[in-house]
């Protein structure tokens, strides 16, 4: 993949995360959807209007956009790479079977 292509993907991911952060930050605590455990892992999913979030431990590592059937893998953006969180994302991806998967990578 060329540098420009990855920069374009990173830009799309940052835009999607901006939408997610807006909804998350503007949802009152009493209206916050419950976290549901992913299999028997230290990972949870949380459904919001239009998207589902994957939390690995206490970090948002992926966002699935239900409208566009796109999975945004933000692990490397928010934390760096860990094998455990990558496994959580793989399970999450298999659960939703998205049409598109976009992965944030440093350029």
Would you name each region that the model predicts?
Residues 1-107:
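Terminal leader/tail segments of proteins
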């Amino acid at each position: 993949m060329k540098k420009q292509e990855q920069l374009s993907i990173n830009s799309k991911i940052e835009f999607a995360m901006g939408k997610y952060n807006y909804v998350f930050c503007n949802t009152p605590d009493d209206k916050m959807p419950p976290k549901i455990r992913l299999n028997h892992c230290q990972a949870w999913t949380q459904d919001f209007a239009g998207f589902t979030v994957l939390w690995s431990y206490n970090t948002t590592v992926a966002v699935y956009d239900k409208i566009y059937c796109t999975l945004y893998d933000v692990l490397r953006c928010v934390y760096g790479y860990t094998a455990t969180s990558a496994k959580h994302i793989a399970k999450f991806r298999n659960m939703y079977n998205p049409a598109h998967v976009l992965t944030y990578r440093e350029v």
